Design a protein with these regions (language model features):
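A short, Lys/Arg-enriched interface patch at domain edges and termini
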Residues: 52-72
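Polyanion-binding surface elements
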Residues: 1-29, 61
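Major-groove DNA-recognition helix of helix-turn-helix-type DNA-binding domains
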Residues: 20-49, 56, 65
Length: 72
């Protein structure tokens, strides 16, 4: 049986904000102030997304950095 290629999973701003437990307004500030945050891109006029995998990698890096800072 032939394996299917992996399909990208995308997230809109509202879903990202929900995952982080913040408002979309706060997410806008994160985008403005954190150059490491994945950038949204338009898939159609008016619909911007980021790749879920990029978001999850960013979140893992943030969690790791927080743990390292916590332990000095």
């Amino acid at each position: 049986m032939k394996a299917e290629p992996a399909r990208a999973s995308f997230m809109r701003r509202q879903a990202v904000a929900f995952e982080l437990g913040i408002t979309r307004h706060t997410l806008a500030r994160v985008l403005k102030n954190d150059p490491t945050f994945p950038r949204f891109f338009a898939i159609t006029p008016g619909i911007e997304v980021i790749e879920r995998l990029d978001f999850e990698r960013w979140l893992q890096r943030k969690r790791l950095a927080a743990r390292l800072n916590q332990h000095g």
